[in-house]
Every structure is written in C-alpha cells, then in structure tokens.
UniProtKB/Swiss-Prot annotation:
SUPFAM superfamilies: Anticodon-binding domain of a subclass of class I aminoacyl-tRNA synthetases (SSF47323), Nucleotidylyl transferase (SSF52374). GO terms for cellular component: cytosol. This is Cysteine--tRNA ligase. Its cofactor is Zn(2+).
Length: 466
C-alpha cells in the first residue's frame, strides 16, 4: 500500500488510482532556452524513482512531461543568438535528453510541446471565454480569478490574502489585479499565432493545463513538479482546468524541495547556477543521481563537493560489495541450512519496500541498501557460500538498482559495455576463422587499450576487465 504526501490536503494519503493498476502522471518539464541546472535535474530524478517504484509494484505508469518551447525566455534567447525560437528549442530539448539520459532518467511516455498544441490551446481559451471564466481585453485574454471559487486551495491562501500586493502593470487591461494571462498580444518581431483574439501566443500556465488534458484526460492521478511551481503556476493550472473540465484536475499533488549551493539558494544574481551539462564532466552521473536521492524528495538538498564525495564513497561501497557477491557466485555450491541469511535478506527487502511505500523515502531506502551491502560483506567472509543465498543477494541488489535507477557497475564515458565486447569477440573469432589475422590483432589490441583481457578457454574466448 503506497502512501504519498498530497500538497493539496497537506497530509499523507493512501494512493488510490482512478483506474485500477494504472497511474496517470504529469510532471512539469523545463523551459528549453538553456542547458538544465541541477535544480531542474532534481524533479527529473525524483519522479523517475516514483515512476520506477510504481512499476515495481505492478502499476502501468503513463508518465507525461512537457517541454515549454515558446516563452519570454526563449524569445529573449533567440534575439541574443540571432536564431529562431524553434532552433533554440530543438537544441536544448536534445541537450535535455542527453543530460537526463546520463543521469539514468528513463524516457517519458510522452513529451508534449507547446507549439504542437497551439490549436488545442486556442480552443481551450475560447471555451473559457465562452463560459465566462475568461475575457479578451486589448488583444490579451485574462482568466477571471475570482469567478473560480476554489482559487488558493493548493497554496492554502485566500483571495483576500492574495489581493494584498496584487497590482496591474502598465499596459495591462485587467478587470481585477488578481486575473492572470491566458493569451498575450503579439509584439513586433516576436513569434506569434493567429487566434480569435488576434495575433499572439499563450501564457505559461494555460500550456500545461491543455497538454495534460490532451495527453491524460480531464482528471489525472498525480501532478508533480518543484516547490517553486506550487504558486502561481500549479494554482493557476487548477483554476483553468477545473473551470474548463468541470472535474478535479489532479487527485494528488507532489512537490520536491530546492537544491541549495553551499547553503545558498541558487540564483543568477549570486552566479551560483550549476549546469548538469558541466557537472557530469567532473562528477560521475551515477554519483550525482545517488547524491540527489540520498535526501527525501520533499526536503531541501545542499550541494557541495564534500557531500558529493560522500555520495561517491557510499555508492562505491555498495558496488564493491556487489562485486564480491558476483565473484563468490563463481564458486558457490548447493549448501543447506542457509535460511538465516535468506531471512535477513528478506527482512532488508521488506524494510526497503516499507520506506518506499511511505512517501517514496529514498533516503531510508539507501540505508537499507547499505545494510544489504554490510550483510553481503559479512557473508563472503565465510568459508562456504550457498548458490541460493548468492542468488538471493544478487536479486535484491538488482531490485534496489532498478527502483532507484542506480547501476550496479560503473560505466565510464569511454568504457565498452559487455554486449559491445561480446560483439567484438565474435568479430575477432570470425576474422581468425577467415585468416584475417591483422583484423583479429587489431580487435585484440583495441580491447587491451580498454583494459579488457581475452582468455582462451575450453568453452571459448572469455574476457575480463583489468
């Protein structure tokens, strides 16, 4: 039974899907005007783990995460670089996939883009105007915030609280300072689309409402994103979506905490933004992922090199213990009376599931993984090893690895994968068979340069890493 903290109710709730056995999940993705920073990477990693755990528990997860490919920041960037908005977006969408792929974040079921849904967005806004929830003014379209009775329920603020400090900027034609933009009138030289309200482009909030509706329907199970999106972005999404669809927008809202840099909030003014594109040149991406999930997703994380080094050391400890188990697997035999170890491994697995069932507590899940490694180290020190116990260890290690998304073996950027090595060995065997010894020697030397040693055995050629 999975429980999660619902920002909407401010309490943990038992997860009950709309459709048995299925999870419909929408995660707010990046505005693709630059490489992502470590703060953008956190939700990608955290909600990837959530998805993986649901799948481990047998759910079919439809995981949708959008790209905002038209926005003020993109327009400004395109003007700075003298490139079109689509060109900028394409570049950084590709960079996003590369960066999060390095962090072992699995591809979403769907990555909708704003530009691909422009007709849907325009129709959605038109529907809101027709229903009286929105109005056109001076070429812009605004949402009537006060007309939606539930406004403020996610951020737990009242309309009266919000009214304090609300203002109408120069050039805006709002009925009320609390109203927010659905459609922006085109400015000279900016990318725009034709609509019943005139040339323009959508506001940020309406985009996610429409893409979520198009991809997942009127009501979704889980909507997730960073804490900074709770207000006004997610609050406005609820207002638009529920006014339009006459149904709850999302049953559960999840928000991850911030990442601070050396105990200071990331900000452009401080110049302490750290791009994932740059970090992974210096820090193993597996270590970075392990570092992020070593803290509960709702808690803030402090990023500094000392803490990253601690994560590297912890992951190395886990991997070293797994390597010992793999080595013992070569000499393991069928030994009876090993139930004590089987029971201890099962107890650790049960604890892992218990803490993951409790709002996806990856910090405590990693503690369980450390305990598994400690037990494994103790076991391999014994003179005899049981095939049953070794297989049990390996199976549970693999479960932890799959759920948390942290590989059990390090993959250096220039390191060949095992399947690649096997293919090269097959090619070398074929070359030798055809008496193409030059090619056979070339392959052997290439593998040797990667510290891969070939060994001839009665069962054929095998390899080991030096």
């Amino acid at each position: 039974m999975i429980t999660l903290y619902n920002t909407l109710t401010r309490q943990k709730e038992v997860f009950k899907p709309i459709e048995p056995g299925k999870v419909k999940m929408y995660v707010c993705g990046p505005t693709v005007y630059n490489y992502i920073h470590i703060g953008n990477a956190r939700p990608a990693i955290n909600y990837d783990v959530v998805r993986r755990y649901f799948e481990y528990q047998g759910y079919n997860v439809e995981y949708v995460s959008n790209f905002t490919d038209v926005d003020d920041k993109l327009i400004k960037r395109s003007q700075e670089l003298n490139q079109t908005v689509p060109e900028i977006a394409e570049k950084y969408i590709a960079a996003f996939h590369e960066d999060v792929g390095a962090l072992n974040v699995r591809k979403a079921t769907s990555n909708p883009r704003v530009m691909d849904h422009m007709d849907d967005i325009i129709q959605f806004i038109k529907d809101l105007v027709d229903q009286g929830y929105a109005y056109e003014s001076g070429g812009d379209v605004y949402f009537r915030t006060r007309k939606f009775e539930g406004y403020g329920k996610l951020s737990h603020q009242s309309i009266d609280d919000l009214k304090v400090g609300a203002r109408i900027d120069a050039g805006e034609h709002k009925e009320d300072a609390l109203d927010f933009t659905l459609w922006k009138k085109a400015k000279p030289g900016e990318i725009s689309w034709d609509s019943p309200f005139g040339e323009g482009r959508p506001g940020w909030h309406i985009e996610c409402s429409v893409m979520a509706f198009h991809e997942l329907g009127a009501t979704i199970d889980i909507h997730a994103g960073g804490s900074d999106l709770q207000f006004p972005h997610h609050e406005n999404e609820i207002a638009q979506s529920e006014a339009h669809n006459h149904a709850p927008f999302a049953n559960y809202w999840m928000h991850n905490g911030f990442i601070n840099i050396d105990n200071e909030k990331m900000s452009k003014s401080l110049g302490n933004f750290i791009l994932v594109h740059d970090i992974i040149k210096e820090v193993d991406p597996d270590v970075l992922r392990f570092f992020v999930i070593s803290v509960h997703y709702r808690s803030p994380i402090n990023y500094n090199l000392e803490l990253v080094e601690s994560a590297r050391s912890g992951l190395e400890r886990i991997r070293n213990s797994y390597q010992l188990i793999e080595e013992r697997a070569q000499i393991a035999t069928n030994i009876e009376n090993q139930q004590t170890y089987i029971d201890q491994i099962d107890a650790i697995l049960n604890r892992f599931e218990t803490v993951m069932n409790d709002d996806f507590n990856t910090a405590n899940a990693i503690t369980a993984w450390y305990d598994l490694a400690k037990l494994a180290n103790k076991y391999v020190l014994e003179n005899t090893t049981s095939t049953e116990v070794i297989d049990k260890f390996k199976a549970v290690y693999q479960i932890f690895s799959d759920v948390l998304g942290v590989p059990l073996k390090s993959k250096k950027a220039d390191e060949l994968l095992d399947e690649d090595v096997e293919k090269l060995i097959e090619e070398r065997n074929e070359a030798r068979k055809n008496k193409d010894f030059a090619r056979a020697d070339e392959i052997r030397d290439m593998l040797k340069s990667q510290n891969i040693i070939l060994e001839d055995t009665p069962q054929g050629v095998r390899f080991k890493r030096g």
